[in-house]
Amino acid sequence: MESEQLFHRGYYRNSYNSITSASSDEELLDGAGVIMDFQTSEDDNLLDGDTAVGTHYTMTNGGSINSSTHLLDLLDEPIPGVGTYDDFHTIDWVREKCKDRERHRRINSKKKESAWEMTKSLYDAWSGWLVVTLTGLASGALAGLIDIAADWMTDLKEGICLSALWYNHEQCCWGSNETTFEERDKCPQWKTWAELIIGQAEGPGSYIMNYIMYIFWALSFAFLAVSLVKVFAPYACGSGIPEIKTILSGFIIRGYLGKWTLMIKTITLVLAVASGLSLGKEGPLVHVACCCGNIFSYLFPKYSTNEAKKREVLSAASAAGVSVAFGAPIGGVLFSLEEVSYYFPLKTLWRSFFAALVAAFVLRSINPFGNSRLVLFYVEYHTPWYLFELFPFILLGVFGGLWGAFFIRANIAWCRRRKSTKFGKYPVLEVIIVAAITAVIAFPNPYTRLNTSELIKELFTDCGPLESSSLCDYRNDMNASKIVDDIPDRPAGIGVYSAIWQLCLALIFKIIMTVFTFGIKVPSGLFIPSMAIGAIAGRIVGIAVEQLAYYHHDWFIFKEWCEVGADCITPGLYAMVGAAACLGGVTRMTVSLVVIVFELTGGLEYIVPLMAAVMTSKWVGDAFGREGIYEAHIRLNGYPFLDAKEEFTHTTLAADVMRPRRNDPPLAVLTQDNMTVDDIENMINETSYNGFPVIMSKESQRLVGFALRRDLTIAIESARKKQEGIVGSSRVCFAQHTPSLPAESPRPLKLRSILDMSPFTVTDHTPMEIVVDIFRKLGLRQCLVTHNGRLLGIITKKDILRHMAQTANQDPASIMFN
């Protein structure tokens, strides 16, 4: 997603009538300004929708929350719009949770009044399960549709089925009687483009025509994908996981999970995968599932009017996305917990589990691959692993960690260059160039020409008696009449050595192209390319170990396990371990990754090799930098995301970080009873801050509360329309009792109802490690700094991110949202 597009979505900040506060996120969270009021306030429940009325809560720094004055006592009627959020703002977690508790209390208090109220109470209680059920159903159905369409369009680059145009290559030959076992992919019904256009099935002319058509279809699919993204849904590009992590932490990006994004992402994901680019559909499927969760949450007031509750649905949706991407429901739940979710209560765990279950069930019912499995590359191994194999498994872990560190640095450097040069202004041209280079280089090599998922399937598959792949071209010394379950290790034939050279070239090609492909303006996942790179490396290592064991079975490391004629090495297992190691090196996932790969293979006995490889890859990757690829892209885009994995060990104080600094202008504040409507409107027009502390007087600087810019604007506009006598010279009163005014004075405007009476505060001597902990665990966006009750300044989430960058010797300006 281009940060410029996010920037331009902001409103013009000098317009008083624009309710939003600033045109850039830098100003949204800047200095003395505040993004949004994070604390509980009297407008907590002004909006349980647009019109619901709530309760005022008071909160101390100890964190206790108690019910106080009801808003009905303060407002003649609720003000529509108060308490909602603008684009690119961060939600108020505490206020949203208080709104939900008050809504729950209100429903419980009424449910015994009538059967209708009891029905509403039951509907509210079950709405969480209903929304995750709908999300799971939609995610599974869309994933099946994407899988089927992507397979068909991928085969369209090579030819077409004349008997049924909607069949892919494999389905076309299922019903053919002319298909032989050795050439099972050839049948009269399937015609290559060379056969259709020039009437030749073999020869140089046929090869060149197929080459040209392959490039033509690849470029057509890529161009159509990037054009649809650019014109209809700019947010549909990329994997979406960095933005989803940011959204789940409380940031608001309007439209990122909308219906247009869902529709365009679903269509362009098929096109991008079919174009042959070095990308996968698994990451974007998480984005697709979250779009479904967001859309269905609007059907239920419990979630549509509460941003914190909506994020519980999105956490469950991300679990459903991984469930259908890998056929791993439990792995999906753990992925949501480990990788993307910011707030994950126990209830969300259960609902995530249920959403993943429903999504997997729907996908299994659709059976998109015709193998009764949820993924194309499901495999089963029947031989155990041996202790000496831990050494090559750990080596694969080292390779995965080195690949992950290299990829993150190279890809971030390229994306940063794209942002800072003219090349980034031509996203369509970039996609066309990358697609053209990919297609031209990929076609001659059969392993790069394959769909990446099919490549992984071939690399994972163990060599059995029915395999015809060149990877299984071993010299067979078996007695042909002997029926065997496990084929013993055999010397490699010419086909195996030829395949190894082709795999080495494919490995180099995949490494280079994935760096330049991830981040272009089409839907692009990273899971499958990373797994393919690891699977290629793993298969090569597996064949090498297998041949070593065959020719040197008398070595002491092999003697105890590998007897002559025994099947002791499974190269496909090494491919699986390598795939997990490389994906772990890039994403730094651990537990969820092992469970996902274990669910792919269905083999409990291979968990230890997977754990060894994944932990090794994480340790090696962490030695070069603790960030995974998603955190690196979050930092590149400057999203206000406080990573819970980072430790803050410096000894600075709140006074060192707060704004205003020594040479800054003074803090923009409101006084509780001696400012007019014109004064407040002028302050709103002249500043870009999102909120203003309210003090007793300029002399005392005693803190009274905090008022949001948006709420002030809405309240004043509403008062001018609905209350007689409110003019520019009307006194604005935030105090409980209106001060005595001269008889000729215009009617005062009481705004105590929108004032947060308990803004979260820290003293100037609070250590910053405690402040950072408070921001992370409570999800704060800002807190006020006081000294003996007198207001000194403010600390926002951006101030903390800026400070953490400074302590890490980074340029603070480089991490800000631009």
From Swiss-Prot:
Q: Which GO terms describe its biological process?
A: adult locomotory behavior; chloride transmembrane transport; endosomal lumen acidification; negative regulation of cell volume; phagocytosis, engulfment; photoreceptor cell maintenance; positive regulation of reactive oxygen species biosynthetic process; regulation of pH
Q: Where is this site: Mediates proton transfer from the outer aqueous phase to the interior of the protein?
A: 282
Site annotation Mediates proton transfer from the protein to the inner aqueous phase: residues: 339
Record GO terms (molecular function) = antiporter activity; ATP binding; chloride channel activity; chloride:proton antiporter activity; PDZ domain binding; voltage-gated chloride channel activity; volume-sensitive chloride channel activity
- Record-listed chloride binding positions: 239, 527, 630
Which keywords belong to this entry?
A: Antiport, ATP-binding, CBS domain, Cell membrane, Cell projection, Chloride, Disease variant, Endosome, Epilepsy, Glycoprotein, Golgi apparatus, Intellectual disability, Ion transport, Lysosome, Membrane, Nucleotide-binding, Repeat, Transmembrane, Transmembrane helix, Transport
Q: Where is this motif: Di-leucine internalization motif?
A: 28-29, 46-47, 71-75
Q: Which domain of life is it from?
A: Eukaryota
Instruction: State the tissue distribution.
Output: Expressed primarily in tissues derived from neuroectoderm. Within the brain, its expression is particularly evident in the hippocampus, olfactory cortex, and olfactory bulb. Highly expressed in aortic and coronary vascular smooth muscle cells, and aortic endothelial cells. Also expressed in tracheal and alveolar epithelial cells, and intima and media of the pulmonary vessels. Expressed in bronchus and colon (at protein level).
- UniProt short sequence motif Selectivity filter part_2, positions renumbered to this chain: 280-284
Which intramembrane spans are annotated?
241-248, 313-325, 329-337, 572-586, 590-601, 602-605
Q: Which family does the record assign?
A: Belongs to the chloride channel (TC 2.A.49) family. ClC-3/CLCN3 subfamily.
This protein's name: H(+)/Cl(-) exchange transporter 3
Its lineage opens with: Eukaryota, Metazoa, Chordata, Craniata, Vertebrata
The gene designation is CLCN3
